[in-house]
Amino acid sequence: MAMPRKLKLMNVFLNGYSYQGVAKSVTLPKLTRKLENYRGAGMNGSAPVDLGLDDDALSMEWSLGGFPDSVIWELYAATGVDAVPIRFAGSYQRDDTGETVAVEVVMRGRQKEIDTGEGKQGEDTESKISVVCTYFRLTMDGKELVEIDTINMIEKVNGVDRLEQHRRNIGL
């Protein structure tokens, strides 16, 4: 019987600034595809046609204890679709073998929402920041598994750029 890898420790970096002890949780982007069913003559059913990423495929959210600091506010309404650099670093461990793996997700995008939550004197406060990303790179123990760059039309999975030929076909 095997045990799953569980997140034991994590950190979040925003524009290179560490949120150790402040970041509380991270919801990493769901990598979802836009699929459209197609059913042509002679087909007994439909087949999903892959039209790239869903519109919200690279959305993420993270929460922190307390009120956001100046680093977060400085990036609010920043110019550029990749103006907000975020890095998640996680240490996952299996409890049966003790094996640990480093998981890193590098993202760039724009802050969509800064929710400072409800403030009550003498009680814990939490803020949430939503970011719509245009860049996503997932590595595990230094091995790149997925890299998506929507602006530069790059989509690599295990080192294979699945859009390389498409870029050539349209002169890029």
Curated annotation (Swiss-Prot):
Q: Where is it found, in Gene Ontology cellular component terms? A: virus tail, tube
Please give the biological process terms from Gene Ontology that the record holds: symbiont genome ejection through host cell envelope, contractile tail mechanism
Q: Which InterPro entries match?
A: Tail_tube (IPR006498)
* Superkingdom to which the source organism belongs: Viruses
Q: What is its main location?
A: virion
Q: Which UniProt key words apply to this protein? A: Late protein, Viral contractile tail ejection system, Viral genome ejection through host cell envelope, Viral penetration into host cytoplasm, Viral tail protein, Viral tail tube protein, Virion, Virus entry into host cell
Pfam families, per this entry?
Phage_tube
Q: Where in the cell is it found?
A: Virion
Described by its record, this protein's role is as follows: Forms the virus tail tube.
Family stated for the protein in its record = Belongs to the P2likevirus major tail tube protein family.
What is this protein's record name? Tail tube protein
- Protein source organism: Escherichia phage P2
The opening ranks of the lineage are: Viruses, Duplodnaviria, Heunggongvirae, Uroviricota, Caudoviricetes
